[in-house]
């Protein structure tokens, strides 16, 4: 049994308070407040996800993060603190791969959101460019989110947390999860000995490798950060043509197959 990493029945104003801990994201540290200017917080009354600002009007996240009455916050670090340059938007339009909400747990878990109006760059808000190349196996990558810092029991922090993990060959994830198809549009990333991982509530957030936005968190084992059970991330590089075409106004584009 595995789970999609989105939190259900989450109330953003009722986050469980987490004592200061060395286990952040799971196994990381509090993020530097200046390292996540592109990070979006998506929420409604029932769900929480992350997202990535790729220009002043567009956010990229996971398709399973689609929710009614969604609000999108930029410039957030501690959810209990309102920052001077914090900005809130809502979706003007949502785009799914192959027009589809028919993504499955293995494939096409990507959603592009056009905001109702452009954001203003500020000290804590700025977009992150799409990748120029795919990541290499062995790359050290950064994950971040407001998801649970404990698993399987959940504890939701006020402050954003980050951790470093590694890109593995896709076959490492196929060995861990035999039901995975042979697709290569998914990145396999984690720590083989366990201890660091994205988890419930981190869905849709970025995987950043060598400063480039390479993946979107979407799937993992029921209990996070277990040995030899890496997480799965939508491979952003494989969807660049689709993303750029949508932004340019070609909403009928379908790529890759």
UniProtKB/Swiss-Prot annotation:
Ranges where the Peptidase S1 domain occurs: 25-248
Span of the signal peptide: 1-18
Primary location recorded for the protein, binned into one broad class: secreted
Disulfides per UniProt: 31-162, 49-65, 141-209, 173-188, 199-224
Tissue expression remark: Expressed by the venom gland.
UniProt-annotated location(s): Secreted
InterPro entries cross-referenced by the UniProt entry: Peptidase_S1_PA (IPR009003), Peptidase_S1_PA_chymotrypsin (IPR043504), Peptidase_S1A (IPR001314), Trypsin_dom (IPR001254), TRYPSIN_HIS (IPR018114), TRYPSIN_SER (IPR033116)
Positions of transmembrane segments: none
Family: Belongs to the peptidase S1 family. Snake venom subfamily.
Protein name in UniProt: Snake venom serine protease salmonase
